A protein has these predicted regions:
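Amphipathic alpha-helical repeat scaffolds of TPR domains
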Residues: 179-197, 226-240, 262-276
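A non-transmembrane, solvent-exposed segment enriched in polar/low-complexity residues
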Residues: 32-179, 187-204
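N-terminal targeting signals for export/organelle localization
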Residues: 176, 248-320
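Short, internal strand/loop/helix patches
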Residues: 327, 392-426, 432
Length: 466
């Protein structure tokens, strides 16, 4: 049986207890701010009621008030982190002891971001650097017109300007400045090795200036230093160098692969090479395949690569296209056979896919341009069947044109598997007889010089085959 007892406490003791309860907790507990990061800020026109701070093995969700204000403390290791508000993101450098206040207007996110407090200089530098990168980036069309030497010159100029910007920022954090300098070098080498410059370099066709420059930079890198290859930029260079070099059968690269790197790093390179067995790499796919065969022999993992390689080769121009027969939003079946006699431009997409939705305005523009031509525009949704209502609603809300149909089993649908579709949006062009014209056709929109525009390549391909 539970009972309540009356307890007598003398008046002096009661007063003492009352005083103890009213003393601030901070007297008994002092937080060591040198071991944490204090982060606060004000977001104008917030996109969400939360922001995310992400890094290697770290994630923190911070609440944003209705006024756009936030405040929190973080226990982090020194390094680069991502600041993300569900729509926009930026890089932020954090280390224990930093006390940063951030102001942003999401309507001009990159242009307005500003840091005040301990740690402001490295982060204001990053904000200005990313604006510099955006301003000096070149689009695909401009890149295609450049020779390897012109692209090399452009990259070197940007690299040197980046170093100047870093020096002018008067960074008071030597560790950050050193790592940023290292980052610029790896960024530059990744860009060069992964471009037409790298192809000419590994094939022995580059100019003496390019050859000497890359030889000097690459030979100065200690590939046995595993600690060197920890950042995303150094890893990107590492994979680019070995992928391009091994595919080109470069002796120096092969020697480094066999003698200077560990088994885990080799697995990463193999993974990078596997990505080359793809529609996105038609020109060099055979070379990637032969490289993997040489490195892996006939083990089980290579047999899977071989199967995929043979399947992709079966989807070359002129071969019969895999077929589809799926219902439209009213339930009426639409098949490839029913569209014979027309060019068929297929868009495989989903309502949850941001890059897919970014193509919609340009797809509609393309449809309007070819409205009087014998071209069928077919959009195949690979949403889950349970989301069919959402799909139908988007058709109405976005005023989607063309033929809108829904695959029967999302990613596992036969058409999707037959075309080895591993990422969307994916566009396919089929001729009037049901044969493949392009298993990975140009998208309606191309990104050039910071903007999307109707893609000349798909218009040219359609015109050539009408």
């Amino acid at each position: 049986m539970f009972m309540c007892f009356k307890i007598s406490i003398n008046k002096s003791l009661a007063i003492l207890i009352t005083l103890l309860l009213t003393i601030p907790v901070s007297i008994f507990y002092c937080q060591d701010y040198s071991k944490i990061v204090r982060l606060s800020g004000k977001i104008s026109n917030p996109n969400s009621d939360k922001i995310f701070i992400r890094g290697k093995d770290f994630k923190k969700v911070i609440k944003v008030s209705s006024e756009g204000e936030f405040r929190d403390t973080l226990k982090v290791e020194p390094g680069d982190y991502s600041f993300y508000d569900t729509k926009e993101s930026t890089s932020i450098y954090l280390e224990p002891g930093y006390d940063l206040h951030i102001t942003i207007d999401t309507k001009e996110f990159d242009e307005t971001i500003k840091y005040v407090g301990i740690g402001e200089r490295p982060n204001n530098f990053l904000a200005s650097y990313f604006m510099f990168k955006e301003k000096n980036a070149i689009g695909n069309n401009e890149y295609k017109k450049m020779s390897a030497q012109e692209y090399f010159d452009h990259s070197i100029i940007n690299y040197e300007k980046s170093l100047t910007l870093l020096n002018q920022s008067k960074i008071d954090n030597e560790s950050f400045a050193y790592k940023q300098n290292e980052t610029f070098t790896f960024q530059l080498l990744s860009e060069l090795i992964g471009s037409k410059v790298g192809k000419e370099y590994f094939s022995g066709k580059s100019t003496a200036i390019i050859t000497q420059y890359l030889d000097k930079k690459i030979n100065s890198i200690n590939f046995k230093d595993e600690l060197l290859f920890q950042s995303s930029y150094s890893i990107r260079f590492f994979n680019s160098y070995f992928t391009a070099g091994l595919v080109a059968n470069d002796i120096n690269c092969l020697n480094k692969y066999e003698n200077d790197i560990n088994e885990q790093q080799k697995k990463g390179i193999i993974t990078s090479l596997k990505r080359g067995i793809s529609f996105y790499n038609e020109e060099e796919m055979d070379a990637y395949y032969l490289t993997l065969k040489k490195l892996l022999g006939d083990d089980n993992s290579f047999q899977k690569i071989k199967t995929k390689y043979e399947q992709i080769n079966s989807l070359k121009k002129g071969n019969p296209s895999p077929t589809f027969n799926y219902p439209d939003s009213s339930g009426k079946s639409v098949s490839l056979a029913s569209l014979l006699g027309k060019l068929v431009y297929v868009d495989v997409w989903a309502t949850w896919c941001g890059p897919c939705k970014a193509q919609i305005p340009y797809l509609k523009e393309l449809e309007e341009k070819y409205r009087t031509k014998e071209v069928a525009f077919v959009s195949i949704s690979i949403d889950q069947l349970k989301d069919s209502t959402k799909w139908k609603k988007m058709i109405v809300d976005k005023e989607l044109k063309g033929i809108q149909i829904m695959a029967d089993n999302a990613w596992q649908s036969t058409f999707v598997k037959d075309y080895i579709i591993e990422g969307i949006p994916r566009f396919i062009l089929i001729d009037q007889s049901g044969n493949i014209l392009s298993p990975n056709a140009p998208r309606p929109a191309s990104y050039n010089e910071g903007n999307y525009a109707l893609n000349d390549e798909i218009q040219k391909l359609l015109d050539e085959n009408l």
